[in-house]
């Protein structure tokens, strides 16, 4: 890092980034007023595409899923690095995006996460173009779609979908996506998200009494889930986050559903937890059916996986061939086979887990870049970000913070203050040059595949 800092071209670029801070803020504020919920980022993407062209990047284009990419060509055969910020926000299109200012604080939904990062990408590109500095390897700028929620990392999954393409592979990945400027996220929290729907026939709460109740079955399932035991290390968690169902107090619901979130930093633990969830739900359905005089159901699981939206579906509770058993089934003399409850699973999201050691090269390069700018590194460790995808594939990757101060992310009260905001892009410039190498000044710090 010392060699880079002594080079005039690098100092000129660092100076440019500080002087460009006002323009960066202006573009930042313009973008935060453009609606961009996941899967609807097109307007913001077009804004970014034009700015990338103006900044001097080459090969600027919007890919098949809506990612905006542009390349700053390297001088030789160094590692190919991607730096990314996501264009989507968590807010629906109809959200009021009126920008407010009190003192030095700006408020607008999505102003920080992750609009600030996209603005910094554009400033970085301008700095490289204005000063002419180039790494040994190509640096690809990516304003990607669908990082948030049920976007399920769709944009970066698409980028890394074909690992067999040696020419197009990346040797390293840096995501800008945190309010703590000096923060480094280097572990990937994996997640499995399921929409679980319980199906029955439904009926009147009095005259239909005695048929299995989907809401009761879901209640049984939730009770079982709440008793799960998971390890503290590796941290593994579960939550039923949303429940829906029912039409009235005097109605046995025909259908109800719940959204379940499972997380772990360890892929094996996540797989075990997912299996435990499926077993608990199957048991809950069988218990509710048996309570009202229906036999135990054999489970069947049919994996239907859509590679485009990563939605998996499976079913438990085929109603064919039921054998009523002795049970108190209320006023109903003969249980009907088609009254039994069945359940379907839909995988709403899947984010892979992965780990790297804090001492690995890309983490320590980011630490050195922080120190060079006068910041003390905050090792955040594990989170769920776009870096999950490359980390899970064994590609060196981290997520770092953007410049300035912010808070209230994922709320309509989200805010941003441009305090020392240039330090984020300055750190990123040094990090990218250290990773890709700077010919005649410093060799690259990441392994480079042969192309």
What is each of the regions a protein language model found here?
Residues 83, 102-150, 192-198, 207-229, ...:
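Alpha-helical metal-binding/catalytic segments enriched in His/Glu/Asp
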Residues 73, 177, 197-201, 263-265, ...:
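Solvent-exposed residues in well-ordered beta-strands and their adjoining turns
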Residues 58, 65, 76-81, 95-96, ...:
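Short coil/turn connectors at secondary-structure junctions
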Residues 1-8, 12, 215-451:
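Metal-dependent amide/peptide-bond hydrolase catalytic core
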Residues 87-101, 186-197, 368, 398, ...:
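Acidic-glycine-rich active-site phosphate/pyrophosphate-binding loop
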Residues 105, 110-189, 231, 250, ...:
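Acidic/histidine-rich catalytic neighborhood of metal-dependent amide-processing enzymes
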Residues 97-108, 199-203, 371-373, 409-410:
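Glycine/charged-rich beta-loop-alpha catalytic/anionic-binding loops adjacent to active sites
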């Amino acid at each position: 890092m010392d060699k880079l800092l002594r080079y005039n071209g690098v100092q000129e670029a660092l100076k440019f980034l500080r002087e460009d801070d006002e323009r960066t803020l202006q573009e930042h504020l313009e973008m935060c007023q453009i609606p961009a919920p996941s899967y609807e980022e097109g307007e913001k993407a077009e804004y970014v595409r034009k700015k990338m062209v103006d900044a001097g990047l080459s090969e600027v284009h919007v890919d098949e899923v809506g990612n905006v990419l542009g390349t700053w060509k390297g001088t030789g055969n160094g590692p190919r690095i991607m730096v990314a910020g996501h264009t989507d926000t968590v807010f629906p299109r109809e959200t009021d995006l009126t920008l407010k200012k009190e003192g030095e604080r700006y408020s607008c939904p999505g102003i920080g996460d992750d609009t600030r990062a996209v603005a910094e990408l554009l400033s970085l590109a301008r700095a490289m173009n204005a000063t002419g500095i180039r790494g040994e390897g190509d640096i690809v700028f990516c304003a990607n779609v669908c990082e948030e929620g049920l976007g399920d990392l769709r944009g970066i999954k698409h980028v890394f979908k074909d690992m067999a393409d040696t020419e197009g592979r990346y040797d390293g990945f840096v995501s800008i996506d945190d309010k703590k400027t000096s923060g480094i996220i280097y572990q990937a929290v994996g997640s499995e998200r399921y929409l679980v729907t319980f199906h029955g026939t439904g009926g009147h709460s009095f005259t239909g009494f005695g048929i299995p109740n989907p809401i009761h079955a879901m209640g049984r399932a939730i009770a079982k889930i709440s008793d799960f035991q998971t390890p503290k290390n590796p941290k593994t968690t579960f939550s039923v986050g949303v429940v829906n169902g029912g039409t009235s107090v005097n109605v046995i619901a025909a259908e109800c559903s719940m959204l379940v979130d499972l997380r772990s930093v360890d892929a094996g633990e996540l797989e075990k937890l997912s299996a435990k969830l499926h077993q608990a739900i199957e048991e809950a359905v069988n218990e509710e059916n048996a309570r009202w005089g229906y036999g135990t159901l054999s489970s069947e699981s049919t994996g239907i996986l859509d590679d485009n939206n990563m939605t998996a579906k499976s079913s438990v509770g085929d109603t064919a061939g039921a054998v009523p058993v002795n049970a108190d089934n209320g006023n109903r003399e003969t249980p009907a086979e088609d009254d039994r409850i069945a359940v379907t699973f839909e995988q709403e999201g899947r984010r892979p887990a992965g780990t790297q050691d804090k001492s690995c090269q890309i983490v320590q390069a980011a630490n050195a870049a922080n120190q060079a700018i006068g910041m003390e590194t905050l090792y955040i460790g594990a989170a769920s970000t776009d870096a999950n995808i490359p980390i899970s594939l064994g590609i060196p990757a981290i997520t770092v913070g953007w410049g300035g101060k912010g808070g209230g992310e994922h709320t309509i009260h989200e805010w941003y203050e441009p305090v020392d905001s240039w330090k984020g892009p300055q750190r990123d410039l040094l990090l990218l040059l250290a990773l890709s190498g700077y010919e005649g000044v410093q060799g690259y710090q990441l392994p480079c595949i042969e192309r």
